[in-house]
Amino acid sequence: MEKEGADYLIIQSNMMTSAMVAKDLAALKLSTKMICLNWAIDEMWVDLVKEAGEGVYGCIPYALWSDENLPGVRVMHQVSNKYHRNIRTRPCHYVQGFVAAMLLEEALKRVPTKPTGKQIREAFETFRNVDTGGLLPPVTYTATSHEPCNSLRIYQVKKGKLVPVTNYITVSR
């Protein structure tokens, strides 16, 4: 990669693949900077790759399990502890799934008792800056956009921890 002048390697894969790549970059002592997109990095990944993860960047659109200062993360911890005690961390997929369930619950509050699929979709489309307690930036759905999030923060692995290096960066729709 260095021979070809690659300064950055951007990876969107699963965490096992990105972990292998990070370890190989470190073993080969390459200076190419690694950027992992949302499914390729989280706190469990950092524990897996150890020192090989130092300096790696991650683009993450939702809160981390360790963001205990956020109300949504505290609720997520309470729910997790109710059913699975002694879990010290959860992967990004858990956070993303929790947010999806939270948003579905909010949509179901806005429909009749036995809703149709169309009514549920229309309920989602009423969302304007729905607060997830910091799990995501405020969520808006419209008839033309069903994207719950168009923002992310960039993190960097520093001393074995994912540390935010930006605030949320938002792309206009």
Spans of features found by a protein language model:
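Extracytosolic ligand-binding ectodomains
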Residues: 1-173
